[in-house]
């Protein structure tokens, strides 16, 4: 073989190798670099989460005004400074809005290929507001007190607050995906709890649709996150339904599709004699540890312990994912769950202070909140 031919083959091979290396390098840069800045920022935010010691100090506030003052230098300070009064409702709204601020930030700083997920997550506040307004209208409570001023259709929600009848609310929601659940409620095809469940089911379906449009690591992480949330909702629904004696056939219809638990397991839970037997059906799923840690509580009729254990499981899984995929959307999801848990503890402290519970007892209770 002539030297020129060998040289040509070598040149062609080198070009192919360099092209492959360039392609792989470009793929890695496209895949991971967009997460460098947002995840560094989120790690800094994690460092500002309240320590257990800080929570114990807040438990000693004695007055709600002191509680607010003690959080002035935290990430909640901005929203708390806008309070109209030091009432439980106003403080809880400020804490909720602080959480919304977090999602809005992620929507802004995360890579474009996952921003849409946080946009859909924000729509949960539309669902919450609609459900809260409808509940208030039906029970005769002031609807405005239950509205969080945020959401894609906030103007419609405000119009709902002013509506005199459920029929007016239906007209306001005409053309949205929320029109049909309200129509079914008005026609008495579903009751209020079923209406609420249907509304949240629509939201989770939108999250699933978005997840299924992704690929690679993003799809893997987001899929586990959303399917775990759906599992949590379905498990809670079944256990509470078993405790209150809801019809099995009606319960099957209310299940949210898209979770990781198989239909056979869910139906076995529905067919179980009582909540404990239903919980036992989860022993061969990834929730075996949840079963182990909450069996005794369920025997005593306490379903909330299962819900706490499920939240803890999801939070731990996202933390593990954020460590395994340090340059991924898992970091944002893990932080979001930590923040949500922190707000849950803060709300518990607020209510207990308002109820004049002793600081020592508040510390005990908050330690149990998850």
Curated annotation (Swiss-Prot):
Parts of the chain that traverse the membrane: none
Cellular component, GO annotation: plasma membrane; proton-transporting V-type ATPase, V0 domain
Pfam family, any one: vATP-synt_AC39
InterPro entries assigned to the protein according to its UniProt record, in alphabetical order: ATPase_csu/dsu_sf, ATPase_V0-cplx_csu, ATPase_V0-cplx_csu/dsu, V-ATPase_V0D/AC39_subunit, V-type_ATPase_csu/dsu, V-type_ATPase_csu/dsu_dom_3
Keywords: ATP synthesis, Cell membrane, Hydrogen ion transport, Ion transport, Membrane, Transport
Coiled-coil positions: none
SUPFAM superfamilies in alphabetical order: V-type ATP synthase subunit C
UniProt cross-references to Gene3D superfamilies, sorted A to Z: ATP synthase (C/AC39) subunit, domain 3 (1.10.132.50), V-type ATP synthase subunit C domain (1.20.1690.10)
Membrane topology: Peripheral membrane protein
Molecular function GO labels: ATP binding; proton-transporting ATP synthase activity, rotational mechanism; proton-transporting ATPase activity, rotational mechanism
One GO term (biological process): proton motive force-driven plasma membrane ATP synthesis
Compartments in which it is found: Cell membrane
Protein family (similarity comment): Belongs to the V-ATPase V0D/AC39 subunit family.
Role according to the record: Component of the A-type ATP synthase that produces ATP from ADP in the presence of a proton gradient across the membrane.
Assembly: Has multiple subunits with at least A(3), B(3), C, D, E, F, H, I and proteolipid K(x).
Protein name, per record: A-type ATP synthase subunit C
Organism: Pyrococcus furiosus (strain ATCC 43587 / DSM 3638 / JCM 8422 / Vc1)
Lineage per the UniProt record: Archaea, Methanobacteriati, Methanobacteriota, Thermococci, Thermococcales
């Amino acid at each position: 073989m002539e030297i020129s031919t060998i040289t040509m083959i070598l040149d062609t091979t080198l070009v192919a190798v360099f092209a492959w290396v360039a392609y792989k390098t470009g793929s890695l840069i496209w895949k991971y670099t967009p997460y460098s800045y947002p995840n560094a920022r989120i790690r800094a935010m994690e460092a500002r989460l309240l320590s257990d010691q800080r929570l114990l100090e807040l438990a000693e506030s004695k007055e709600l005004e002191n509680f607010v003052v003690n959080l002035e230098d935290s990430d909640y300070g901005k929203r708390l400074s806008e309070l109209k009064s030091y009432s439980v409702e106003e403080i809880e709204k400020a804490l909720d809005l602080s959480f919304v601020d977090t999602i809005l930030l992620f929507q802004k700083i995360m890579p474009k290929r996952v921003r849409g997920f946080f946009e859909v997550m924000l729509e949960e506040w539309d669902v919450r507001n609609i459900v809260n307004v409808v509940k208030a209208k039906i029970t005769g409570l002031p609807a405005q007190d239950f509205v969080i001023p945020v959401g894609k259709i906030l103007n419609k929600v405000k119009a709902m607050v002013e509506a005199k009848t459920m029929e007016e609310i239906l007209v306001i929601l005409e053309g949205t995906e929320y029109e049909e659940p309200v129509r079914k409620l008005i026609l008495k095809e579903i009751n209020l709890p079923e209406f609420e469940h249907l509304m949240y089911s629509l939201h989770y379906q939108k999250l699933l649709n978005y997840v299924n449009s992704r690929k690679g690591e993003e799809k893997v992480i987001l899929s586990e996150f959303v399917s775990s949330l759906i599992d949590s909702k379905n498990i809670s629904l079944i256990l509470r339904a078993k405790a209150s004696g809801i019809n099995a056939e009606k319960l099957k219809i209310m299940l949210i599709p898209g979770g990781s638990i198989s239909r056979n397991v869910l139906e076995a839970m529905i067919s179980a004699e009582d909540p404990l037997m239903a919980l036992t059906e989860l022993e061969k799923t990834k929730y075996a540890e949840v079963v182990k840690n909450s069996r005794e509580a369920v025997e005593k009729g306490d379903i909330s312990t299962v819900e706490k254990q499920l939240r803890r499981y999801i939070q731990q899984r996202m933390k593990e994912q954020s460590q395994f995929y340090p340059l991924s959307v898992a970091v944002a999801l893990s932080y979001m769950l930590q923040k949500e848990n922190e707000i849950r503890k803060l709300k518990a402290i607020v209510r207990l202070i308002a109820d004049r519970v002793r600081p020592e007892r508040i510390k005990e209770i908050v330690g149990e909140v998850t």
